[in-house]
Amino acid sequence: MLAKRIIPCLDVADGRVKKGVNFVNLTDVGDPVAIAAAYQQQGADELVFLDIAATNEHRETMAAMVEQVSAQVFMPLTIGGGITSVADMQRILRAGADKTAINSAAVANPELIRAGAEKFGNQCIVVAIDAAWDAAAGQYRVYTHGGQQATDLDAVAWAKQAVALGAGELLVTSMDRDGTKAGFDTKLYQALGATVNVPIIASGGAGNLQDFVDVFSTTPVDGALAASVFHFGELTIADVKATLRKQGVVVR
């Protein structure tokens, strides 16, 4: 039984963490290295950094930040945002990231998944999917550009295609739940888990300890990602893991 992963997510622009992280002993709420080190101490299994500014001039800044973080922190790092080519992937992986996450660029050019997987291995390629329920169509619809643009893609079908092209992991955000603290969209992850055989990370909706228990006990996801509940100390990773252990969920 593989241990389930608890993964904080940090939004970064210009090499700074943008949603202030409210740890008690943090002097600089925007310093990615200090925040990553604090999360490592708390027992996070991985970290995801999303470059929300992601323009050409920010890419070098992002690589420099990854170098600094990876020199100090010894847990897997996934970097997403603005990665649109194999060269972008290479820059981030060389800087010390373990995985690169691609979202809009993969929808626009699915062959980018295959090219990245062939060059770096499937385990380095995470396809991030933003999905929202479309009641009229009776399916989860894929959105791109930070959730701004609807596509014609069905999220479950797109997940299957992404894996066939070489995605080694899926990071799937429920736009319906994101920021609501109403719990993870278990129906979405059940549908995905029945279709693909790579690790799935659930994102969007974490609000309390029971939400983590529910997503791991009712869906086959391998990891759960959250941002604000961890950043503002509403939940600690230690509490999440202790609760999961009590419920028989295997965690690191």
Curated annotation (Swiss-Prot):
Q: Which InterPro entries match?
A: Aldolase_TIM, His_biosynth, HisF, IGPS_HisA/HisF, RibuloseP-bd_barrel
Give the EC number: 4.3.2.10
Write out the GO MF terms. imidazoleglycerol-phosphate synthase activity; lyase activity
From the record, give the cysteines joined by S-S bonds: none
Keywords in alphabetical order, please: Amino-acid biosynthesis, Cytoplasm, Histidine biosynthesis, Lyase
Subunit structure, as described in the record: Heterodimer of HisH and HisF.
Which terms does the UniProt entry file under GO BP?
L-histidine biosynthetic process
Subcellular localization, as worded in the UniProt entry: Cytoplasm
Protein name in UniProt: Imidazole glycerol phosphate synthase subunit HisF
List, from the UniProt record, the residues annotated as the active site of this protein. Answer: 11, 130
What does the protein in this record do? IGPS catalyzes the conversion of PRFAR and glutamine to IGP, AICAR and glutamate. The HisF subunit catalyzes the cyclization activity that produces IGP and AICAR from PRFAR using the ammonia provided by the HisH subunit.
Q: Which SUPFAM superfamilies match?
A: Ribulose-phoshate binding barrel
Report which reactions are catalysed by this protein: 5-[(5-phospho-1-deoxy-D-ribulos-1-ylimino)methylamino]-1-(5-phospho-beta-D-ribosyl)imidazole-4-carboxamide + L-glutamine = D-erythro-1-(imidazol-4-yl)glycerol 3-phosphate + 5-amino-1-(5-phospho-beta-D-ribosyl)imidazole-4-carboxamide + L-glutamate + H(+)
Which family is this protein grouped under?
Belongs to the HisA/HisF family.
Its top-level enzyme class, in one word, is lyase
Which top-level group of life is the source organism from? Bacteria
> Pathway it belongs to?
Amino-acid biosynthesis; L-histidine biosynthesis; L-histidine from 5-phospho-alpha-D-ribose 1-diphosphate: step 5/9
What is the taxonomic lineage of the source species? Answer: Bacteria, Bacillati, Bacillota, Bacilli, Lactobacillales
Q: Which Gene Ontology cellular component terms are annotated?
A: cytoplasm
